[in-house]
């Protein structure tokens, strides 16, 4: 169920990485046309009290990009980047980051601490292995259907 915060956040990260990560067609096209740089980042916080997901980026076209991202999020279930093939790629990417992070005690300590529920960082390989596109879509619906989208634009001085 959705009570398992860690698994939920991993599946949500997979969905948003498919749509907005560097392997997505959307990111590639915005990057190639100079509308986005590599500063695009994704932050997810899922716990028993509140959930949030934050996309941050530098762009010269905040209104257009914001509109495009909002539409993509609303129509995530039919997004061309949300596919079995792309999910397999993202799963490998998440697993690679996991293996890499095992070299960092600090990372393990902070990650281990932030999820005191049933699963931990060490369950990640199993979560990745068992993750299906249907699971990802289900979590996506649960999160997006129950969320408000808020935009902040910070202009340089």
Show where each model-derived region lies:
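Generic, well-ordered alpha-helical scaffold segments in large soluble proteins
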Residues: 18, 72, 139-142
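Bilobed periplasmic-binding protein-like "clamshell/Venus-flytrap" ligand-binding domains
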Residues: 137-140, 145-153
């Amino acid at each position: 169920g959705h009570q398992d915060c860690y698994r939920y956040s991993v599946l949500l990260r997979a969905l948003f990485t498919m749509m907005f990560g560097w392997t997505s067609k959307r990111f590639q096209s915005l990057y190639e046309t100079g509308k986005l740089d590599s500063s695009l980042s994704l932050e997810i916080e899922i716990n028993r009290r509140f959930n949030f997901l934050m996309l941050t980026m530098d762009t010269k076209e905040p209104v257009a990009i914001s509109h495009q991202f909002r539409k993509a999020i609303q129509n995530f279930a039919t997004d061309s980047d949300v596919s079995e093939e792309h999910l397999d790629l993202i799963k490998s990417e998440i697993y690679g980051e996991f293996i890499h992070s095992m070299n960092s005690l600090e990372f393990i300590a902070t990650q281990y601490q932030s999820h005191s529920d049933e699963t931990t960082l060490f369950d990640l390989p199993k979560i990745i292995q068992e993750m299906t596109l249907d699971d990802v879509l289900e979590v996506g619906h649960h999160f997006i259907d129950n969320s408000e989208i808020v935009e902040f634009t910070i202009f340089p001085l």
